[in-house]
Regions:
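Binding-site signature for planar aromatic cofactors or substrates
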Residues: 1-135
């Protein structure tokens, strides 16, 4: 996840069990991102805007990919133009302690290799749960 400026964010979408975000962005570019504080200071931050999704063959993907570490399972880059920011108290958000990142996804992707990842997309990620096409 990268902040480009006060009105633009981008993130690398990794291969997973579904491709829901991409499918829904093809139908409607509106997106909401929510951040929660799980430590001492309660807070919820929401970013509202419109997003574009770029696949590895897109020029924007090639340009933005330089911002991220290389992941075998990289599927798309999502770029969101922020048009509204909202905060709320976060009083109902529980305390949670961060332990560490999980490594299984990247390890699994490395075993599949890039060709195996692309086959996984064909086998598992061509439609959303609603039946919408994905990229």
């Amino acid at each position: 996840f990268k902040v480009i400026d006060t009105k633009k964010i981008v993130w690398l979408n990794l291969t997973g069990s579904g491709n829901e975000t991409a499918a829904h962005l093809l139908k409607n570019k509106r997106m909401t991102i929510m951040f929660c504080s799980f430590d001492e200071t309660p807070l919820i931050l929401r970013l509202y805007g419109n997003a574009n999704i770029y696949h590895e063959s897109d020029q924007e993907y090639i340009k933005l990919k330089k911002l991220f570490k290389n992941f075998t399972g990289a599927r798309q880059i999502i770029e969101m133009d922020i048009n509204q920011v909202q905060t709320s108290c976060g009083y109902a958000v529980p305390f949670m302690e961060y332990k560490q990142e999980r490594t299984q996804l990247n390890e699994s992707d490395l075993k599949k290799g890039r060709d195996g990842i692309k086959q996984y997309w064909k086998d598992h990620n061509t439609k959303s749960l609603d039946g919408f096409e994905t990229i």
